[in-house]
């Protein structure tokens, strides 16, 4: 696992609470890459390429700094964290993200952009702690605790889930560099950088042949009307069992083949390539249109 804790800050709960109250009033809308999630998934841009409050698309900045949106003005504590903790010269985008009773399917980010993947640096500052919220990164499942700042290797196959209704708000700050860099350069305040903290790694059950056979038996259940539901179901398996998240798509292809529906097989292969292979900037994918 390349993802790891970068440091930890003490959150001012009173100031944070006021910001969270504002974020709760912002309407939930269709997200960029909304096909990656089900349930409650809400992203609110605080800084982005355009300064537009509805602009949720991450893209490379060309010689101009990230612009604050009107939402940034309404969350002064989070805005202070962004501008004092992080290296503003490298800031590409900052947004809050919330996930409740939902899963984000395994995927890779930055594949539609122009820089070398190692030049993108995504961080998550956890603002709230939901005990049943987890992230996965290749072969590991982690629970991010409130106040922890993580580097999330978003170029690897990764996923997120919250099995509960408890809010799990985070501040996602994306930075980018032009060449080789030291990760502590992500911070304006060098005292924040403390990468030796121990992570909360989730223990998982062994993935057995019997468990795999049970998954493949879904070929007797899957159909075009529940194809999307089966994908999200399979996306949760690796949080309980010790198996790579990328297997989600191999199971989906196999189950679709077992059902004998060529259209489903084609869609399963296409969502696999779209999520963890390559896609164009702004490209979308429908899981329900046949």
Curated annotation (Swiss-Prot):
Residue sites binding Fe cation per the record: 107, 109, 158
EC category: oxidoreductase
The EC number(s) this enzyme carries: 1.14.11.28
Keyword Membrane: no
Keyword field: Dioxygenase, Iron, Metal-binding, Oxidoreductase
One Gene Ontology molecular-function label: proline 3-hydroxylase activity
Catalytic activity: L-proline + 2-oxoglutarate + O2 = cis-3-hydroxy-L-proline + succinate + CO2
Pfam family, one: Pro_3_hydrox_C
Temperature dependence: Optimum temperature is 35 degrees Celsius. Is stable below 30 degrees Celsius.
pH-activity dependence text: Optimum pH is 6.0. Is stable from pH 5.5 to 8.5.
InterPro entries: Asp/Arg/Pro-Hydrxlase, IPNS-like_sf, Pro_3_hydrox_C, Pro_3_hydrox_C_sf
Regulation (activators, inhibitors): Inhibited by metal ions such as Co(2+), Zn(2+), Ni(2+) or Cu(2+). Is also inhibited by EDTA in vitro. Unlike the procollagen-proline cis-3- and trans-4-hydroxylases from mammals, does not necessarily require L-ascorbate for activity although it does increase the activity of the enzyme.
Tagged with keyword Plastid: no
Biological function: Dioxygenase that catalyzes the 2-oxoglutarate-dependent selective hydroxylation of free L-proline to cis-3-hydroxy-L-proline (cis-3-Hyp). D-proline, trans-4-hydroxy-L-proline, cis-4-hydroxy-L-proline, cis-4-hydroxy-D-proline, and 3,4-dehydro-DL-proline are not substrates.
Protein's name in the database: L-proline cis-3-hydroxylase 1
Source organism: Streptomyces sp
């Amino acid at each position: 696992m390349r993802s790891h804790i970068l440091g930890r800050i003490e959150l001012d709960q009173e100031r944070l609470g006021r910001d969270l109250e504002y974020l709760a009033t912002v309407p939930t809308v269709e997200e960029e890459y909304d096909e990656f999630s089900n349930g409650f998934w809400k992203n609110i841009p605080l800084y982005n390429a355009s300064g537009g409050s509805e602009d949720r698309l991450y893209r490379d900045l060309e010689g101009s700094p990230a612009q604050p949106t009107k939402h940034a003005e309404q969350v002064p504590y989070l805005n202070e964290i962004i501008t004092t903790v992080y290296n503003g010269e490298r800031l590409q985008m900052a947004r809050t993200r919330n996930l409740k009773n939902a899963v984000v399917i395994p995927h890779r980010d930055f594949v539609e952009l122009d820089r070398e993947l190692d030049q993108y640096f995504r961080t998550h500052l956890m603002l709230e702690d939901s005990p049943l919220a987890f992230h996965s990164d290749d072969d590991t499942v982690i629970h991010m605790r409130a106040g922890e700042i993580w580097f999330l290797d978003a170029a690897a196959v990764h996923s997120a889930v919250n099995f509960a209704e408890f809010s799990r708000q985070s501040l996602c700050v994306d930075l980018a560099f032009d060449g080789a860099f030291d990760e502590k350069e992500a911070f304006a305040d060098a005292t924040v950088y403390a990468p030796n903290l121990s992570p909360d790694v989730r223990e998982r059950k062994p993935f057995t042949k019997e468990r795999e056979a049970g998954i493949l038996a879904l070929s007797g259940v899957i159909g075009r009307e529940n194809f999307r539901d089966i994908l999200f179901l399979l996306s949760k398996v690796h949080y309980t069992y010790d198996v790579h998240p990328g297997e989600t798509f191999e199971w989906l292809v196999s189950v679709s083949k077992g059902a004998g529906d060529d259209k489903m097989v084609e869609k399963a292969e296409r969502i696999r390539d779209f999520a963890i292979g390559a896609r164009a900037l702004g490209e979308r994918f429908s899981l329900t249109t046949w």
